[in-house]
């Protein structure tokens, strides 16, 4: 479920590539889930919650639809300095157009990067056995061009900013992004370090 049609389309294409047939995709708002209470064995969220204006309301809705004893796990981005692939693209855009300083309390990529923040929201929603851990990994791409293509497909905040640019500005940003990405070449691939936080909690019996 997602509010963004392009994200659902990307998920659908990936499911097709993987040959998955037991999955469905639908547009919806996590702060008002169209499902009965106590109806899900598990809920997962992948890089979604930090973009919501009402995160506590979303957590309460997730807790509502979970069956007693069932779990939710949500992945969000960790600190920006640990995720250069994201900062790289935003820096390139800022070199082309003026952007206002980000509001740390507003919805955004790193809104839930602070350790324990999402865990606290889950606890307030009534979940128990709540955990919050940071995981380190890598993103690997065949080329800087592949990284750029992937970025334009899945990074909604970048997509929204790029949509406001002229064709010449878009080309300028693309060149800046691919040049900066080339600094992360390892052998014949582009490899970025990444860090995510995963918070999980269980609905009480």
Model regions and ranges:
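Short, hinge-like loop/turn segments at secondary-structure boundaries
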Residues: 16-19, 41-42, 90-92, 148-151
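Class I SAM-dependent methyltransferase SAM/SAH-binding core
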Residues: 1-36, 42, 56-60
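A short SAM/SAH-binding and catalytic strip from SAM-dependent methyltransferases
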Residues: 41-56, 78-80
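Conserved catalytic/acceptor-binding region of the Class I
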Residues: 56-57, 67-142
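Short SAM/SAH-binding signature in class I
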Residues: 39-47, 73, 196-199
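Conserved Class I S-adenosyl-L-methionine
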Residues: 13, 30, 106-205
